[in-house]
């Protein structure tokens, strides 16, 4: 099956604003820092120093935190905050508080904390960028050593956020230029784009966040081994799993389920030749899988994006929100992709074949191997071996019935069932021609004499369905279970014994 996907939302790891509140007992009460971390464990996994100081803002900056949450919609809010945005909010509350200008605060909420909802898909985010940028210009905050600053590069505007991680914020139309600036500073970034992707005269009304990648490893357990999958694929797989949970919840009608992505290729840019040479076998396999899973048809406004879903994986998924459930689903999804898209791993219960050769699995952690091509070669060799084994099995089996038939001169083979059907037809014809009173002798033995003095039996039968040899020369029928060939002295199997006549006629 396929589900639609859009380009109008971020692929970032997010949590809902409502998660800051006690959802079980009192929704107007902010939870403690320990409860918040426990209930949203996935966003803190492999996060390094992103969230240092979280406990302090839940204790010492609680009033400022309340103001931000109220602006974001409070306990009933549908908005979400990204992983990087939460990190920036912690740093902001450690040093600053909200402005008296409501417009500036609204811009801070979106540009710095990356709190967003579906309303941003309709546009207006570039205006928020301009509001905050002009405010920083008025305050002459152009020093990148500060938490918030502004700058220009090749006449393109950007906002620089220097927190526990670094984020460049710019209009989507300027993203490539600002990414060039980040690369010149050795900042390896990933992009999240939020806003409307409908093009107008000034470009798309969307804002791009270029955040420096984490130094920590993002790992997954695959086929009993641990591999580093990197932050980008970790984010992508999280979005995939969350979307597939929606498919599982709406298994009878998944037409309304959509995956929100931000590029034609999905969430991770496809590897070029240089990237493939540097990537591990697992990353190359995931890159190959993306080319299969993330489909695009058409161009411009007619472009249709979709994501391929396998029903056999939906049946394997666990439904839940806990950290362990999410991690387990991510691990299962990677294994599923390796089997179905790359032919690596153990054969799936749905019948999809794969190769789990140990040397092939070792290549997943190594660089410089085209693991997908190697898997195809291994699968081809497996198929050849299976065909060879089938041929050997055929040669070792018993010879066919046709090959075991021995026919003498003037003889032809006829199966017992075919012979009986012909016999019944001939018997019916003969009975119709005879008188109503039958000869008792003929009842036990029905023999015709040809002009040459030979005798032909009209009702040769054999109980077993292995067939009999019907000789066109003389044949005597002694009873319904015994066939005796006078010319060849050959007789068929019998269940009723030999008659005395047969015993006297049998050759030595």
From Swiss-Prot:
UniProt region (Disordered), positions on chain: 424-464
Composition skew (Basic and acidic residues), residue ranges: 455-464
Composition bias, Polar residues: 424-453
Protein name: Non-structural protein 1
């Amino acid at each position: 099956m396929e589900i639609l996907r859009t380009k109008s939302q971020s692929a970032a790891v997010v949590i809902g604003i409502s998660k800051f509140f006690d959802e079980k007992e009192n929704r107007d009460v902010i939870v403690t820092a320990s409860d918040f971390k426990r209930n949203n464990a996935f966003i803190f996994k492999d996060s390094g120093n992103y969230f240092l100081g979280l406990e302090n803002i839940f204790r010492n900056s609680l009033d400022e935190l309340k103001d931000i949450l109220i602006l974001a919609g409070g306990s009933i809010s549908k908005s979400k905050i990204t992983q990087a945005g939460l990190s920036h909010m912690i740093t902001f509350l450690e040093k600053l508080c909200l402005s008296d200008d409501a417009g500036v605060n609204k811009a801070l909420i979106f540009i710095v904390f990356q709190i967003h909802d579906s309303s941003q898909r309709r546009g207006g985010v570039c205006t928020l960028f301009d509001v905050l940028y002009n405010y920083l210009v008025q305050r002459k905050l152009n020093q990148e050593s500060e938490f918030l600053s502004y700058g220009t590069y090749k006449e393109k505007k950007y906002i620089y956020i220097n927190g526990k991680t670094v984020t460049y914020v710019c209009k989507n139309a300027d993203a490539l230029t600002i990414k060039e600036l980040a690369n010149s500073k050795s900042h390896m970034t990933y992009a999240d784009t939020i806003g409307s992707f409908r093009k107008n005269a000034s470009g798309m009304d969307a804002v791009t966040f270029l955040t420096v990648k984490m130094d920590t490893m993002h790992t997954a357990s695959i086929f009993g081994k641990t591999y580093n999958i990197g932050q980008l694929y970790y984010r992508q797989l999280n979005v995939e799993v969350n979307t597939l949970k929606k498919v599982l919840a709406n298994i009878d009608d998944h037409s309304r389920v959509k995956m929100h992505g931000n590029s034609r290729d999905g969430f991770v840019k496809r590897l070029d030749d240089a990237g493939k040479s540097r990537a591990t076998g697992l990353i190359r396999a995931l890159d190959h899988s993306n080319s299969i899973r993330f489909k695009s048809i058409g161009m411009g406004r007619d472009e249709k994006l979709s994501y391929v879903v396998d029903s056999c994986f939906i049946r394997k998924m666990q439904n839940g929100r806990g950290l362990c459930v999410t991690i387990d689903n991510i691990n299962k999804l990677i294994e599923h992709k390796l089997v179905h898209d790359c032919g690596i791993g153990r054969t799936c219960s749905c019948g999809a074949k794969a190769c789990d050769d140990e040397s092939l699995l070792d290549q997943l952690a190594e660089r410089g191997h085209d693991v997908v091509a190697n898997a195809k070669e291994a699968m081809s060799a497996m198929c050849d071996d299976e065909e060879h084994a089938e041929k050997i099995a055929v040669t070792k089996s018993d010879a066919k019935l046709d090959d075991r038939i021995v026919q003498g001169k003037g003889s032809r083979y006829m199966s017992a069932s075919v012979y009986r059907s012909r016999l019944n037809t001939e018997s019916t014809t003969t009975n119709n021609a005879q008188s109503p009173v039958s000869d008792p002798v003929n009842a036990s033995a029905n023999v015709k004499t040809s002009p040459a003095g030979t005798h032909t039996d009209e009702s040769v039968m054999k109980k077993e369905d292995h067939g009999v040899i019907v000789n066109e020369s003389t044949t005597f029928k002694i009873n319904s279970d015994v066939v005796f060939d006078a010319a060849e002295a050959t007789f068929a199997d019998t269940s009723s014994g030999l008659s005395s006549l047969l015993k006297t006629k049998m050759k030595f």
